Amino acid sequence: LGTWITMIRTPAVLTLLRAAGLDFARVDMEHSPFSMETVADMAALARAMNFPLVVRPPEGNREWITRLLDAGIWNLHVPQVDTAEQAAAVAACCRYAPLGERGMYGFGPHTEYVTRPPAEHMASANARVHVTAMLETRGAFEQLDAIASVPGIDALTIGPTDLAQDLGVLGTPAQRPALDEHRRRLV
């Protein structure tokens, strides 16, 4: 059981969430004013507490993904993945060669400040990262099978509000049935 963190921009909120019995938290950088510095501090505390932290970056691009991974975030919830090509680009940014094209930064939070042989670090990092692609448009669902088959995309989910908006059902009685239908397609 987890929750989204959207308004409380202090790492200490993680201690409260864990004390409340939650198993993980998601930080929303797409629709909230979190700075990279705050998220990096949250990542450090989450690692110290052994409390899984998921981050939704503002965009699923190399810049944001690299910065979050280098800060020690292992679970990404990537928004607006509409095509298999986008999914492949996201997956490539998240993993080192030979599985991807992630840039190498040798020592920091992402290595837990442990120096080890590069091949060992790369294999460990590739195994730890978990990438969820958010499907938020009709076009994404038209490419569902292609997106789902991209190596390195570990899970799929919907972005319910954006999807409802794209389908033209946001705020109408048709919203819930339309979203339920799209959720079933992911199972």
Description of each model-found segment:
Residues L1-V187:
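Expand to "…catalyze enediolate/carbanion chemistry for C-C bond making/breaking, isomerization
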